[in-house]
């Protein structure tokens, strides 16, 4: 750290490199925080978490009991040991509570005054955060597995919705109706995700073993159907274009939007080039996945080499995205983990499990990593994740 600070002060290093190196060090030191609890409100499993991107202070959780809870993650007590309190909740006694399991919650990307939730009760609800009242409700004919709003959209207010049916539905928050439908999958849609780079690009994952990329402005079908074999095993058959050998039940773009990660019930995770759909063939080994519905995993942001955090049974596996190396397994839950979310401001991770608990994982402050200029090679040998994979083109593109 001191070496980086001196180099930055002397103008020998880009300040961004210091920030990325420190972010990387903190992610590599993640451990269960023994001084911080998240108030336990859910009486059954926690299915979904989301931290608002404006301040990074408030977190939503949705449970199998249909309950939605809003937490304040800030330590206002200034004490070393504290509990992240629930600010408010949509409990079982609330008149507008979801009847069945809440599968996805998401903050409105530009303002904490609104959030959305979807459930097995076949509804997508839009909430006013301040009053905890419903602003709008979208009703569907099928169970809702997943929904997502674009984090970068300025020209549309579309919410992509994946249901038990094979069609992806796009709901317009401005008009309050489903604007159009994307057809191409053959079975239920288990996960949907908008690109953080291009506002009209959408990724979808289905139980038909396929993952697709769409430009929602086009009426002629999907842009790309991801093929794990990169077209080498079969030149013609559409049936050959499968992303996994089982259900594809999880999607996540990298923070720059240049790549897409998918997970499937074949116990594999794959990394794809999001511009041409090419399988990069990064080998992550076995990534255990027995989820019958969507698996919500997340990626880091602002590190020298980015990381992916994947629920792995009752643990969370941490991999470097571009090398496939497994860094660690975060152990603390008693039952299967269904979701996790990364807080990029402080490099913290929050996870939700079927044991009804939400755990906080924070950087360990005990161990320091050598950062002297003379010890750069030693640092690289300690962990290849410290090697700076950033280039200016990533930021400019």
Swiss-Prot record:
Pathway recorded for this protein: Protein modification; protein ubiquitination
Main location: nucleus
One Gene Ontology term from the biological process aspect of the record: single strand break repair
PROSITE patterns for this protein: WD_REPEATS_1 (PS00678), WD_REPEATS_2 (PS50082), WD_REPEATS_REGION (PS50294)
CC per GO annotation: Cul4-RING E3 ubiquitin ligase complex; Cul4A-RING E3 ubiquitin ligase complex; nuclear matrix; nucleotide-excision repair complex; nucleus; protein-containing complex; site of DNA damage
Organism domain of life: Eukaryota
PANTHER family the record matches: DNA EXCISION REPAIR PROTEIN ERCC-8
Protein's name in the database: DNA excision repair protein ERCC-8
Modified residues (Phosphoserine): 391-393
Gene it is expressed from: ERCC8
Entry's Gene Ontology molecular function annotations: ubiquitin-like ligase-substrate adaptor activity
Keyword terms: Chromosome, DNA damage, DNA repair, Nucleus, Phosphoprotein, Repeat, Ubl conjugation pathway, WD repeat
Record-linked InterPro entries: G-protein_beta_WD-40_rep, Rad28/ERCC8/Ckn1/ATCSA-1, WD40/YVTN_repeat-like_dom_sf, WD40_repeat_CS, WD40_repeat_dom_sf, WD40_rpt
Region named Disordered: 370-397
Subunit and interaction comment: Part of the CSA complex (also named DCX(ERCC8) complex), a DCX E3 ubiquitin-protein ligase complex containing ERCC8, RBX1, DDB1 and CUL4A; the CSA complex interacts with RNA polymerase II; upon UV irradiation it interacts with the COP9 signalosome and preferentially with the hyperphosphorylated form of RNA polymerase II. Interacts with ERCC6/CSB (via CIM motif); promoting recruitment to lesion-stalled RNA polymerase II (Pol II). Interacts with KIAA1530/UVSSA. Interacts with a subunit of RNA polymerase II TFIIH.
Annotated localization: Nucleus; Chromosome; Nucleus matrix
Function: Substrate-recognition component of the CSA complex, a DCX (DDB1-CUL4-X-box) E3 ubiquitin-protein ligase complex, involved in transcription-coupled nucleotide excision repair (TC-NER), a process during which RNA polymerase II-blocking lesions are rapidly removed from the transcribed strand of active genes. Following recruitment to lesion-stalled RNA polymerase II (Pol II), the CSA complex mediates ubiquitination of Pol II subunit POLR2A/RPB1 at 'Lys-1268', a critical TC-NER checkpoint, governing RNA Pol II stability and initiating DNA damage excision by TFIIH recruitment.
């Amino acid at each position: 750290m001191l070496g980086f600070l001196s180099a930055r002060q002397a103008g020998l290093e880009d300040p961004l490199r210091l920030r990325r190196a420190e972010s990387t060090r903190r992610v590599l030191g993640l451990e269960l925080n023994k001084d911080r609890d998240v108030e336990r409100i859910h009486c059954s499993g926690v299915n979904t978490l989301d931290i608002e991107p404006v301040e990074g202070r408030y977190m939503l959780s949705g449970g199998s009991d249909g309950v939605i809870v809003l937490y304040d993650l800030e330590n206002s007590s200034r004490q070393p040991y504290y509990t992240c309190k629930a600010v408010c909740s949509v409990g079982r006694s609330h008149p507008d509570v979801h009847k069945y399991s809440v599968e996805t919650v998401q903050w409105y990307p530009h303002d904490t005054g609104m959030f959305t939730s979807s459930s097995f009760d076949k509804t997508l609800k839009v909430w006013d955060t301040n009053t905890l009242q419903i602003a709008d409700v979208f009703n569907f004919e099928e169970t809702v597995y997943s929904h997502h709003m674009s984090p970068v959209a300025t020209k549309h207010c579309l919410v992509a919705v994946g249901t038990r049916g094979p069609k992806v539905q796009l709901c317009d928050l401005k008009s309050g109706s489903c604007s159009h439908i994307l057809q191409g999958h053959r079975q239920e849609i288990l996960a949907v995700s908008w690109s953080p780079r291009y506002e009209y690009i959408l990724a979808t994952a289905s139980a038909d073993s396929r993952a697709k990329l769409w430009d929602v402005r086009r009426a002629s079908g999907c842009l790309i159907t991801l093929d794990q074999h990169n077209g080498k095993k079969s030149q013609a058959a559409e049936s050959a274009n499968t992303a996994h050998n089982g259900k594809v039940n999880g999607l996540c773009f990298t923070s720059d939007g240049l790549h897409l990660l998918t997970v499937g019930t074949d116990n594999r995770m794959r990394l794809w080039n999001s511009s041409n759909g090419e399988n990069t063939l990064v080998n992550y080994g076995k990534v255990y996945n027995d989820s019958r519905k969507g698996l919500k995993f997340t990626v880091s942001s602002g590190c020298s080499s980015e990381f992916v955090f994947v629920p792995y049974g009752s643990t969370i596996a941490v991999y470097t995205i571009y090398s496939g190396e497994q860094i660690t397994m975060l152990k603390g839950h008693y039952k299967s983990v269904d979701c996790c979310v990364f807080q990029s401001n402080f490099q913290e991770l929050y996870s939700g499990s079927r044991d009804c608990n939400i755990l906080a994982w924070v950087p360990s402050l005990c161990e320091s990593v050598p950062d002297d200029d003379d010890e750069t090679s030693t640092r690289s040998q300690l962990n290849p994740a410290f090697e700076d994979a950033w280039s200016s083109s990533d930021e400019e593109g």
